[in-house]
Amino acid sequence: MESVLLSARCTANTATVFWNKPENANADTVYEVSLDGGHSVHTNRTHYTFTELIPNTEYCVTVYNIGSIRICTSPARHRIYVTEEPYNAVGDGKTLNTAALQQAFTDCGPNDEVYFPAGIYLTGALDLHSCMAVYLEKDAVLQGSSDPTDYLPRIWSRFEGTEQECYRSLLNAGQLDHTAGANCENILLYGKGTISGGGHVLAERMIDIERENLREYLAQNAALVATCENDRTIPGRVRGRLINLSNCSRIRITGLTLQNGAAWNVHMLSLIHISEPTRLAL
């Protein structure tokens, strides 16, 4: 049997197994995968996710002609329901829930997860912290507002290689310091829902505000502006992202749809140990 590395990432109820593509594989190669020797599934990808598993339980996953790996699901987390006391967030797509959601995030301990049932939860910028989890149920949408003032105060960030103050992103983890290591770690963002930003409307509003702030600078540096794509390029560097991860370690994002960032959907700065990209809506 060819020796090809297998690895896995688990939650309480799911396990995703990854393997390296064998040298003799091609685009038509189909892999046979089984859990504890049970019914086999087939995939043409080099990963597979098992669902509806039992928390805190060991399993053996076999990828035939590749190898086997023993895995263990994590213990079930205590759920902090954002719609219940003392948070009472409203998923109507109209009520601004920033304060309530931030409190739920702040209260989330290492064995907890902030839980969003189905609904559209309008919010401004939210701060993540080490050792926490966020779960979005199917049809749950964490919806960023389109008002730039909901993303203040600005934070130190980097845009196209230039460090500067930028609007906060919808989700923010860590503080940027290119001279130091990780200052935020062990965050899990997962589920079946969607994280959606303020999109083009928010981006244009942020740019308009910054153009006014930089009016004199842009006028005095017309030659520099002329080298840019257009006169909105320099002001556009203040835009927040959908998810901003700065100086973070061991971040996992899985199962979610990410869409409509005012700039990039996921911006990773000075990071290590990032796993499982999620679905990006184009």
Feature-to-residue mapping (PLM):
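Extracellular "leader-to-stem" segments immediately downstream of a signal peptide or signal-anchor
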Residues: 1-115, 122-123, 129-133, 137-246, ...
